[in-house]
Curated annotation (Swiss-Prot):
This is Indole-3-glycerol phosphate synthase 2. It comes from Streptomyces coelicolor (strain ATCC BAA-471 / A3(2) / M145). InterPro entries: Aldolase_TIM (IPR013785), Indole-3-glycerol_P_synth (IPR045186), Indole-3-glycerol_P_synth_dom (IPR013798), Indole-3-GlycerolPSynthase_CS (IPR001468), RibuloseP-bd_barrel (IPR011060). Belongs to the TrpC family. Its EC number is 4.1.1.48.
């Protein structure tokens, strides 16, 4: 695990520990059981054409603040109005300015499947995601031992959610497939130095194989990048910074899906 990723994971563990002290796992289990049924994240990404997972995050660790007017409910409605297929919500606090509360607000404001975007390493975070209304969550291969990845993926599905399993190279694709991942996200951003390689999805497409949803993550600057990824065989793109900086994110999404 890279130094940058290790630091983010350590902070996620610390944040989870603080929340665990305030709300027990037993209580979360009750809340998760009472949450509305999960919306089908994978099915939304399998719709004809290029699907868009529209992400909301107030900050970037490498670029700082992305907006000075962060309103998750309004963003969720704008994303849905623009034709997004799903919403991704950063809940990691340090570096991203996220909060679990943002997810609950976004989920209540739209009818799209909502993904919890965080550094998930603990079953508590999975229960918390479902209790907040999440329909899916992110699992990063580079942050987890293979057996741990498989266990967390199974726990995610037992809670009625799907996982976006993130990879960055051939070995990680193999680990994701062995764990049973159905939705695989190729992160074009190298978490060791935050550099971007937009050709990565094309190189890994054959490795992922058919029958699974493949998502291109990071570095989509506009419609040309989206079209290139679609031509490479990607089923969906996850777009964050472009939308956060857009004056009209709904119109920007229409340009990506059109």
């Amino acid at each position: 695990m890279s130094g940058i990723l290790a630091g983010l994971v350590a902070e996620a563990e610390s944040q989870t520990g603080r929340r665990r002290a305030l709300r027990t796992e037993a209580k979360l289990t009750e809340l998760a059981a009472a949450a509305p049924p999960a919306r089908d994240f994978a099915a939304a990404l399998r719709e004809p054409g290029l699907a868009v997972i529209a992400e909301m995050k107030p900050r970037s660790p490498s670029k700082g603040p992305l907006t000075d007017d962060y309103r998750p409910a309004e963003l969720a409605r704008a994303y849905q109005g623009g034709g997004a297929h799903a919403v991704s919500v950063l809940t990691h606090e340090a570096g991203f300015g996220g909060s679990p509360d943002h997810l609950a607000v976004a989920r209540a404001a739209c009818e799209l499947p909502v993904l919890r975007k965080d550094f998930v390493v603990d079953e508590y975070q999975i229960l918390e995601a479902r209790a907040l209304g999440a329909d899916a969550l992110l699992l990063i291969v580079a942050a987890l031992a293979p057996a741990r990845l498989a266990a967390l993926l199974a726990r995610t599905r037992a809670c009625g959610m799907e996982a976006l399993v993130e990879v960055h190279d051939e070995r990680e694709v193999d680990v994701a497939l062995e764990a049973g991942a159905d939705v695989i996200g190729v992160n074009h951003r190298d978490l060791r130095d935050f550099s971007i390689d937009r050709t990565l999805s094309a190189r890994l497409r054959g490795r992922v194989g058919t029958g699974r949803v493949m998502v291109g993550e990071s570095g989509v600057r506009g419609a040309p990048d989206a079209r290139a990824l679609e031509a490479a065989g990607v089923d969906a793109v996850l777009v964050g910074e472009l939308l956060m900086r857009a004056g009209d994110p709904g119109t920007t999404i229409k340009g990506l899906v059109g």
